[in-house]
Amino acid sequence: MPEETQTQDQPMEEEEVETFAFQAEIAQLMSLIINTFYSNKEIFLRELISNSSDALDKIRYESLTDPSKLDSGKELHINLIPNKQDRTLTIVDTGIGMTKADLINNLGTIAKSGTKAFMEALQAGADISMIGQFGVGFYSAYLVAEKVTVITKHNDDEQYAWESSAGGSFTVRTDTGEPMGRGTKVILHLKEDQTEYLEERRIKEIVKKHSQFIGYPITLFVEKERDKEVSDDEAEEKEDKEEEKEKEEKESEDKPEIEDVGSDEEEEKKDGDKKKKKKIKEKYIDQEELNKTKPIWTRNPDDITNEEYGEFYKSLTNDWEDHLAVKHFSVEGQLEFRALLFVPRRAPFDLFENRKKKNNIKLYVRRVFIMDNCEELIPEYLNFIRGVVDSEDLPLNISREMLQQSKILKVIRKNLVKKCLELFTELAEDKENYKKFYEQFSKNIKLGIHEDSQNRKKLSELLRYYTSASGDEMVSLKDYCTRMKENQKHIYYITGETKDQVANSAFVERLRKHGLEVIYMIEPIDEYCVQQLKEFEGKTLVSVTKEGLELPEDEEEKKKQEEKKTKFENLCKIMKDILEKKVEKVVVSNRLVTSPCCIVTSTYGWTANMERIMKAQALRDNSTMGYMAAKKHLEINPDHSIIETLRQKAEADKNDKSVKDLVILLYETALLSSGFSLEDPQTHANRIYRMIKLGLGIDEDDPTADDTSAAVTEEMPPLEGDDDTSRMEEVD
């Protein structure tokens, strides 16, 4: 609940002042800004100008459908007014303004999603200049100000004043000062050691560096002096007025003030009479527009330097780093538009946060800003691209609904995607830069393969993966194809959690032995990507963890494999009977070398890795889990001593109870090594403990065993049993 206090100065009409506490995270952020030393404090001006520009964008957009919105002020501009006497810097805009509720919510009581993320980034050593990307740029004012006053007027509300010295609270009151019409005035009461930001030269320098491409005129108001000749009488009159003025309070700084310098005199004829003249100094307000630069996207790309692109990118995005790549182009013919697209150096912290509306590409119509969150302009997988699109053909007063139906927009979108892919392909020619790009945006490329069937082929050329033959370098699918063996028909891949895990997997044993390269796909999104990417350059992509793996074989090898199948046919049948519904079938493997067995999945089911990913989904559909979960096939290695001994044991006595124990243990171990999870890990653990006891020669019936182990052994019968029952089976 806000505390309410009353000021006593107004006998006629008492002004109500409400005090609010800052939301905890915002108070923490302000404390961090105020109490930490930052060298580049100047970014506060960029942030406040950027906020003003956004407010002007909003009122201009509203006025396209309702011109009366501008009745409260036709001109859209930003003014900067330094005042050395009062040590204040004022930023005024004629934007949309804020209602009382906006003031309270936006400036203090509701934390934006970026507040905490920005504080964490700061504490991890990030630059303060990143503040704008997290949506909390306003608070950078406290880098230089000890107190901030915000006066604002929205068309739908009265004029209000917000004020805070950052002591954990702020006040809001109705403002009875000079009416603004519409817009916002931010008054910074500067700290004693920050007066450099009142200097004309310094303000110009900052605006040129950070804000010269803002789409509204930024005017600097500076009080200056100039010489003026007046007659003696006039000078005396002015002097008297000056003295009177000093006695009274200054009413307005904008009125010229004149003081006597009194030495030069000359005679001159005026209207036929001789009058004495005096030179006096007159104070006046000089107005200078600081951003007269033509919109950069309308210029010829050949005339624009890399530095200019860099400056524009930073002013557009509030990024503190240079862009990684840029594409500047125009399309002419039936449809005309210009576009300037940038690839940032790093992905934003909330790249795939769906709730947040992206505002990465600004849409203009004939140089007039329309909107910056047009979802139809670019597909989601390219949501990291920043830039501007300026159309000649869209109507100025276009609404969101019309945009969704607009054929023009569909053509623009198609061209933007095409140019982005061109840009990535150009970037791929520079190995070092592409590596940086791929580290940040590989998920976007893979999401594109999943979603954009039209451009899937081009996107697949941009993929890079580690393979069993690539070492620490990532290679393209094209590189893989050039290294394929003569009789190799497929591209082999394995999905998993880490590079080491998949490299040591049982599934790649025989392929590596035969010198066949296997692609390691170790990101969760690879599972989705590869579902859509069935082939590359006519070669099918084959998972080495699924049934029916075909490896290049000669006739001799085929014959040997058939013999092994016949030899182990009986064991496969016995194992299937023991495992029942746990597996769909048991077969002799052609993919294992050192492992006794593995679990493979059916061609159209999920891999073990995909099953793990789906189980981790908080909002998963359990019915889907039922029919998509992998149908498991157990493959045994006919050349492994464990499997050979098990075959002999089973053929000697197919009712041997220990065979069942061993088969279940093999199956559960294969589940784990193949990337699946156990439904009942405790039972599996108990089996392993019993084997350890046997290995250590511990007699489970030993009366000297402590109570705890006795309690455990009740649940864990020994491996060897009598003729009637297998104790291992009892645990099941």
UniProtKB/Swiss-Prot annotation:
Q: How is its activity regulated?
A: In the resting state, through the dimerization of its C-terminal domain, HSP90 forms a homodimer which is defined as the open conformation. Upon ATP-binding, the N-terminal domain undergoes significant conformational changes and comes in contact to form an active closed conformation. After HSP90 finishes its chaperoning tasks of assisting the proper folding, stabilization and activation of client proteins under the active state, ATP molecule is hydrolyzed to ADP which then dissociates from HSP90 and directs the protein back to the resting state.
Region entry Interaction with NR3C1: which residue ranges? 9-236, 271-616
List localization entries.
Answer: Nucleus; Cytoplasm; Melanosome; Cell membrane
For the modification Phosphotyrosine, the affected residues are 313, 492
Motif placement: TPR repeat-binding: 723-732
Processing after translation: ISGylated. S-nitrosylated; negatively regulates the ATPase activity and the activation of eNOS by HSP90AA1.
Main localization of the protein described in the UniProt heading: nucleus
* Cellular compartments per GO CC: apical plasma membrane; axonal growth cone; basolateral plasma membrane; brush border membrane; cell surface; cytoplasm; cytosol; dendritic growth cone
Q: Which GO terms describe its molecular function?
A: ATP binding; ATP hydrolysis activity; ATP-dependent protein folding chaperone; CTP binding; dATP binding; disordered domain specific binding; DNA polymerase binding; enzyme-substrate adaptor activity
Annotated ATP binding lies at 51, 93, 112, 138, 400
Q: What is the effect of changing residue 93 to A?
A: Impaired ATP-binding. Strong interaction with HIF1A, MET, KEAP1 and RHOBTB2. Loss of interaction with HSF1 and ERBB2. Los of interaction with TSC1
EC annotation? 3.6.4.10
| Residue(s) carrying S-nitrosocysteine | 598
Is rRNA-binding there in the keyword field?
no
Q: Which reactions fall under this protein's catalytic activity?
A: ATP + H2O = ADP + phosphate + H(+)
Q: Which residues carry this modification: Phosphoserine?
A: 231, 252, 263, 453, 476, 641
GO biological process terms, alphabetically, are:
activation of innate immune response; cardiac muscle cell apoptotic process; cellular response to heat; cellular response to virus; chaperone-mediated autophagy; chaperone-mediated protein complex assembly; mitochondrial transport; neurofibrillary tangle assembly
**Location of the region described as Disordered in the Swiss-Prot/TrEMBL record:** 225-278, 700-732
Subunit structure of this chain's protein: Homodimer. Identified in NR3C1/GCR steroid receptor-chaperone complexes formed at least by NR3C1, HSP90AA1 and a variety of proteins containing TPR repeats such as FKBP4, FKBP5, PPID, PPP5C or STIP1. Forms a complex containing HSP90AA1, TSC1 and TSC2; TSC1 is required to recruit TCS2 to the complex. The closed form interacts (via the middle domain and TPR repeat-binding motif) with co-chaperone TSC1 (via C-terminus). Interacts with TOM34. Interacts with TERT; the interaction, together with PTGES3, is required for correct assembly and stabilization of the TERT holoenzyme complex. (Microbial infection) Interacts with herpes simplex virus 1 protein US11; this interaction inhibits TBK1-induced interferon production.
Function according to Swiss-Prot or TrEMBL: Molecular chaperone that promotes the maturation, structural maintenance and proper regulation of specific target proteins involved for instance in cell cycle control and signal transduction. Undergoes a functional cycle that is linked to its ATPase activity which is essential for its chaperone activity. This cycle probably induces conformational changes in the client proteins, thereby causing their activation. Interacts dynamically with various co-chaperones that modulate its substrate recognition, ATPase cycle and chaperone function.
- Please state what the protein is called: Heat shock protein HSP 90-alpha
Which organism encodes this protein?
Homo sapiens
**Organism lineage:** Eukaryota, Metazoa, Chordata, Craniata, Vertebrata
